[in-house]
Amino acid sequence: MSELNYEELGLKVGLEIHQQLNTPHKLFCNCSTNLEEEYKLTLERYLRPALSELGEVDVAALFEWKKGKKYVYRIPITTSCLVEADEEPPHAINEEALKIALAIAMALNSNIVDEIYVMRKIVIDGSNTTGFQRTAIIALGGMLKDEEVSIQSIAVEEDAARKIDEGTDQVTYSLDRLGIPLIEISTGPDIRSPEQAERVALKIGQLLRMTGKVKRGIGTIRQDLNISIKGGTKIEIKGVQKLELIPDIVRYEAIRQFNLLKIKEELYRRGLTKELVLSNFVVKDVTELFKNTNSKIIKNGIEKGGLVYGIRAYKLKGVLGWELIPKKRRFGTEIADYVRALAGLGGLFHSDELPNYGITEEEINKVREALNATTEDALILIVGERERLDKAVEVIKDRILLAFDGIPKETRGALDDGTTKFLRPQPGSARMYPETDIPPRRIDEKLLEDAKKLVPESPESKMKRYIVLGLSEELAKEIIRDPRLDLFEELVNKYSPRVPPVVIASTITNTLKYVKSKGGDISKINEEDIEELIKSIYESRISKDSISEILVEYTTSKNVELKDIIRKYEVLPIEELEKIIDDIINSNLDEIRKRKDKAVNLIMSKVMSKVKGRADGKIVLELIRSRLKNVIE
């Protein structure tokens, strides 16, 4: 995909960072914030939307309710209580969570509010047993200065229940995650490129981790993106868990929106209107035409008692196959997403991609004839139960009509390849109302004083401190930019000075680059692996010189444990090392006498090649020098 000119495109990106806070108990009860697989009970709920304080029903809540799904909740033994089950009022807000959030607000120069009011945000996708999420703004404004990106708001809120499984009619959640304290940091729409979006997310994430008061690991931090271009509308993208995906998500979303606007132009260029398309929209049951089909999807659908509907989309030939993201998504994919989300059907085909999937040209022509369609029309085929098909027809019609508006207001979900899919309509202002069970909390001086003690150190201060620890200026800059900065701090506190900070920093930065250059899959290396290596150096089990070789072997091998590779590289006993050095010296006496003092490098190279990282370079050098002295003299 060729790079777009983001300035001409009018790209605007805002971020919402959601980070779990590492407190002993949840935001509104005393349950543990650990995750727990064991459970003994379940409860079942059907949720429906309530009126907001404006007396209106939120469009996103209405959308979820129309799915008619049943929600099943697993009740863990030690990580949930009657509060999570919505059978007991919430307790007072977690004071430690407030202190951590206020400290982060101070670091971002935000304006802290005088009084905290907990609100209910209507959410009825089943992720909250109550049908709402409790949230409270604690600060407004602020700035990420080096990126010139404004902070709009900072809030504390309760995390959602953890999704275990989802079917067509039922979703299963665990209540262990529900109520874990989150901080939500929302930036202004000031980000202007995919790369800047990643940098901003990285810097905010580092700031959060440097408090030492946030959880780490998969699922503990999530990024949402708000993306728009000139002539379009803001699109929300939910659930980005991998930082490195952010640039691709921004690029793909920008080009998707650009092409949706191009489709809008094309529709009007063809002289089409919503009324014209609607009045010529034809639907027929064409099941009989596919009774002998070779298409497995259609055949399986019919065998299960399903029907096949054919739809004529007036003068839309080429539009359904229009690439929104080259080689990844077409306009037809967008329609299929809507049908999947709203009607629960997956079997959708359109004429811009046919013949294919076992559907023949002859079958297409029969459908075209049955629908009285011309070659300028697009054909759509859907398979399923009659009730779902009828719902799907309305969904397809509505999504085609939305194309005349360009970019519909949507909430989309992030996918692993950097693309996104439709989740639901965007929520509006009709989704908030006050929490009546929790009184306001005044921000007093003691709370502010306690928060000040948690404010993380500035990057400039870190730089000076790291140089004092022995890091070069370049290495100090690199570790400050690294997502594992907080791991570096933790390992230095645990294992320094026996393991020099420069060794820890180099392992996290330069060594991983080296491993990648050798074809290693560095995604296999987690924070626990890095600590295991540093701990092994601390315990004198391995030499710092063996780290690269250990990690290369670990990341290029299958079905091996890191601890087994570490065992292979354990430091040689001094007697064995001395024997290796003596043998190599005795085998190279003529060359040593010829080179004299310069022979040190020759022997050093041969010894290190022989021991393969199982000896400390400094010790090897000392032993070689003492022995060569006798030989040369």
Swiss-Prot record:
Region feature (Disordered): 415-437
Keywords from the named record: ATP-binding, Ligase, Nucleotide-binding, Protein biosynthesis
InterPro entries noted in UniProt: Asn/Gln-tRNA_amidoTrfase_suB/E, Asn/Gln-tRNA_Trfase_suB/E_cat, Asn/Gln_amidotransferase, Asn/Gln_tRNA_amidoTrase-B-like, GAD-like_sf, GAD_dom, GatB_C_1, GatB_Yqey_C_2
Name of the top EC class for this enzyme: ligase
GO biological process, one term: translation
Family: Belongs to the GatB/GatE family. GatE subfamily.
Alphabetical list of NCBIfam families matching this protein: gatE_arch (TIGR00134), PRK04028.1 (NF003107)
Record note on quaternary structure: Heterodimer of GatD and GatE.
Function: Allows the formation of correctly charged Gln-tRNA(Gln) through the transamidation of misacylated Glu-tRNA(Gln) in organisms which lack glutaminyl-tRNA synthetase. The reaction takes place in the presence of glutamine and ATP through an activated gamma-phospho-Glu-tRNA(Gln). The GatDE system is specific for glutamate and does not act on aspartate.
Identification of the protein by name: Glutamyl-tRNA(Gln) amidotransferase subunit E
